[in-house]
């Protein structure tokens, strides 16, 4: 009888654990499904001028006459639509700072030119605006309520726009991080061990 009771108890524990894991997995999948439409890919470009020396000038005894050429460089980031009605997008300031062009790519592949509404270099935040219909936003949470050890999810475009809306997970590793780089750097960082790669910034 004791053996039977023990077996039933063990089966019940395993079933309960599987049920909890299943619920947890479903909850994460639901969060990802709801969040992804509000996450955007940010593609920026900048015109860079470089001085190049003319090889022909060198051979014709004019070696010190540089020739200026312009190059367009591109960078990638992510953002979150926080106000669908007004087309406001929240991202990191370093993603759009000093860029000549900013393009937003939505989850449905539509693309829009964006304008900068405001920036705060100290907190590394920027607000962009696009004129677009049929977009979804997501509400902002209260960072004062988070706790170390809580699960988090990151959605963004690591490395390439072809990898847009990649989902990674982790936990809150620490809160209130400040002066990581220097005394004038960002304040009150939230640290996470979720995979964050180039292109994820702002998501």
Language-model features: locations:
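Sec-dependent signal peptide recognition
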Residues: 1-9
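Hydrophobic h-region of N-terminal signal peptides that target proteins for export
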Residues: 9-17
């Amino acid at each position: 009888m004791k053996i039977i009771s023990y077996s039933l108890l063990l089966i019940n524990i395993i079933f309960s654990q599987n049920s909890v894991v299943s619920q947890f997995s479903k909850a994460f999948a639901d969060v990802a499904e709801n969040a992804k439409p509000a996450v955007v890919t940010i593609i920026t470009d900048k015109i860079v001028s470089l001085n190049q020396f003319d090889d022909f000038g060198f051979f014709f005894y004019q070696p010190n006459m540089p020739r200026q050429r312009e190059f367009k460089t591109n960078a990638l980031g992510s953002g979150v639509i926080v106000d669908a009605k007004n087309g406001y997008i929240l991202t990191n300031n370093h993603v759009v700072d000093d860029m000549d062009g900013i393009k937003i790519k939505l989850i449905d592949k539509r693309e829009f030119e964006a304008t900068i509404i405001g920036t705060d270099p100290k907190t590394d935040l920027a607000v962009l605006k696009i004129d677009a219909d049929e977009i979804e936003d997501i509400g902002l949470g209260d960072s004062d309520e988070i706790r170390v050890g809580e699960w988090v999810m990151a959605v963004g475009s690591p490395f390439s726009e072809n990898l847009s809306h990649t989902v990674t997970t982790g936990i809150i590793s620490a809160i209130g991080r400040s002066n990581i780089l220097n005394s004038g750097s960002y304040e009150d960082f939230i640290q996470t061990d979720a995979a964050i790669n180039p292109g994820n910034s702002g998501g």
